[in-house]
């Protein structure tokens, strides 16, 4: 369009051309709609109101295609129908798949399944820290650990479907999702769960999926699973699946390093039962899978100590985090300090004492607890977690942690991460840097590293 405008502008012909030439007006209209489609997909605009973005994006696509159909000559319309056919085929296949998964007429009724035309009915339970547990018993399909579905609940969030990772295994015979409330649909789900009184009535839901694929982790010698907040819905099923395979004697993986970063101890309860079961299942195995699990609590006000004097401030963190004055903290009274893993230095070597490393760590400055060991013990007792699950304050030194596992691996290693954008970016950067240092791709003979990054959103 710029080429035409530049050519017409030399002769001041643009207004006259648009006035007398309907084809030019149609082309300009299509170009304007296409420009809006591109601009509206930019993250700052898209994230203002995602539900509105989806609706206007579909409407804009239909409008753009219609204008182009009118604009092009008759013998060129086939090139417009081609993408329309692809889009409609996708919609038809997805609709048929959705109907098959959710209509009970296509499936044999399982014992305990609710009667009705819709085969999937969900209960909603409020969890600590504004999270919602969505549970769907007796699903009609199978899935693999780490896969996700699009969940649609017309009675609570009409005309919307959102992607959520399945937090259970097929052997559990139920679908479960842990959904953190933000805004829009997730906030309405939490409000419904929080306001519901027992016994909780189930709601009809539609499930579209499962989707997602990754390399089987059981083919690696060492697996590092890193999650932030509800990212554990991705890593926990992977951990449980590896443990299950190990108990059945069908696993080549030697070690799993499980790291979960949360803001408060209330979030640990989301998967405390599953984590306890996985750790206890491998505890009795002879020469079986080794699971090393750590939970890092970054911003819980009950887990830090602060004295009146700035220089005398102390921390209960087992990883060497220090507490700053409240005046230096953010609005949520969350301070950033430096920390490393317990027993590890920056380079990844082990040491009986902790040594600070240049890694930003978030801890809090509101004093309640007075001794770290007492706090950790109380958390483990409260959540019935075994002592082998390390509870730490502050953020992990991911470079040292990952490097240690790669150095100790006896074969190829895999790193899988799911969480906020910041966590994913750090893991990407650290794994890439370590691979360069180890010269994995430069013919040194070092074993390869597989990295899988799973993110929130679309």
Question: What function would you assign to each model-found segment?
Answer:
Residues 1-96, 100-101:
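Membrane-embedded alpha-helical bundles of multi-pass integral membrane proteins
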Residues 85-124, 204:
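Membrane-interfacial segments at transmembrane helix termini in multi-pass membrane proteins
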Residues 166, 209, 235, 258, ...:
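Hydrophobic, well-ordered secondary-structure elements that form the walls
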